[in-house]
Design a protein with these regions (language model features):
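A structural signal for short, hydrophobic/glycine-enriched beta-strand patches
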Residues: 1-163
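A conserved mid-domain beta-alpha-beta active-site/ligand-binding segment of alpha/beta enzyme cores
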Residues: 165-201
Length: 201
């Protein structure tokens, strides 16, 4: 059994749950196909009746950085889901979010408009992004059981992130953001126990 001093970082960042029956599968936005493909596989295996990809594009960039045939992350992810066999009626729409915090907020708004009660949800995200995704979505869905079913992207996994300088920078950058981006959210909870949609991070 490993006992490296940074194993606690691995356990903190790289969440990985076994999929269970859920009400919806969340797919935070991005310009890579892996998460949509994993979400489609989970859908086709019967784990949830809906998939909710979310995203417009990265706010600092101002446009979708993937295939120029698509205007938004949602369009891109939706197309992959369709190609993988997910029926159009099972794909929900959220195409306004520009970063992960907004993915969580806007996804909640979509489901509230549908009057959907979400007891259990699956989140398919990049493996190194798992903890921060969990924190954002848990803040917006406090009473929902969230299961993280990640995909390895950029070759960054729990068993190799510490072997390469670029991978180390990505993972430790996530650790830093899990602190820096939650100051205002957690402080807001002192007086406001509800969802903190209005907090700017």
């Amino acid at each position: 059994m490993s006992n490296r001093f940074y194993d606690c970082i691995t356990e903190f960042i790289f969440l990985d749950d076994k999929p269970q029956k859920a009400d919806v599968i969340f797919v935070p936005g991005g310009n890579y196909p892996d998460s949509a493909r994993r979400a489609a596989a989970l859908f086709l295996e019967g784990y949830a009746p809906y998939v909710l990809p979310s995203g417009m594009y990265s706010k600092p960039v101002g446009h979708f950085t993937g295939d120029p045939a698509y205007r938004t992350e949602w369009e891109y992810l939706r197309d992959i889901l369709l190609k993988e066999g997910v029926p159009e009626g099972a794909i929900l729409r959220e195409d306004q979010a520009t970063f992960t915090w907004e993915n969580a907020i806007c996804s909640r708004h979509v489901l509230e408009k549908m009057n959907m009660q979400v007891k259990t949800a699956i989140i398919v995200c990049q493996a190194f992004h798992a903890r921060r995704c969990y924190l954002y979505y848990k803040e917006q869905f406090p009473d929902t059981k969230l299961l993280i079913c990640p995909v390895v992207t950029k070759g960054i996994a729990r068993d190799n992130w510490f072997l390469d300088e670029e991978k180390i920078d990505v993972v430790l950058g996530e650790v830093e953001r899990c602190g820096s981006q939650f100051h205002r959210i957690i402080k807001e909870k002192i007086t406001n126990p509800g969802p903190c949609d209005h907090v700017v991070i």
